[in-house]
């Protein structure tokens, strides 16, 4: 692993076809194409988690740039407003870290947060929410902020869709997704047609924004433990990241058969949350 010009550069052992390039000219000799940028959080949910940018030029040219430490425990989501502000939900939630692996000893509340895209630092604000263990957060094309919460399979509100007031942090229930355990939603994404996608660790769903009802699309094939989902409108492609050690990976998602095509090794473990930076 080397750094060059402030960028993280690596030759990927698990995906030989993918190289994390440090040069803005790219790794190949082909003409440079426009960059599709994503933001994600790695080493999540630890307080020393980092915001990273992921620049995709093609399947052989992916650049991962560490931006900075989040500085707050439990920031597992990332969403981008139309105004260009990055949001997350931070705090222990209902996460019981019995082995003290992530520095969280007891469950606690979560709050909406903004993330500085230059430093990675998260600032929590607004009304705290209890026992929702929110992982999934995303803005709709009309600017509405959505989240899915309540990870308790025994709860009558398990896997419920919410709208979130981005000024106060207040949650308003839309309705239960109806997706059964273990399909708790880890991330959300919208395509250009306004379709809301939800990813559990094991499969892809669509979610009705008016009722909250989720419909299974397909199981993921060729990967699993998906916890990041992002849509790139320029390429009309759905991307995903997984939550694993020692290194997470970036994939392209085939929405017809669920196949996950590997794009790159992210270079960090435990990636959670993915959002596209639109031009």
Each language-model region and where it sits:
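Bacterial Sec-dependent N-terminal signal peptides
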Residues: 2, 18-40
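Short glycine/acidic-enriched loop and turn motifs that connect beta-strands
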Residues: 44-48, 92-98, 102-106, 151-156, ...
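Surface loop/turn motifs at the tips and blade-to-blade linkers of beta-strand repeat domains
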Residues: 65-71, 125-130, 174-181, 218-222, ...
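Conserved beta-propeller blade signature
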Residues: 37-42, 85-88, 144-147, 195-198, ...
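Blade-level signature of beta-propeller repeat domains, shared across WD40, Kelch, NHL, RCC1
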Residues: 249, 255-279
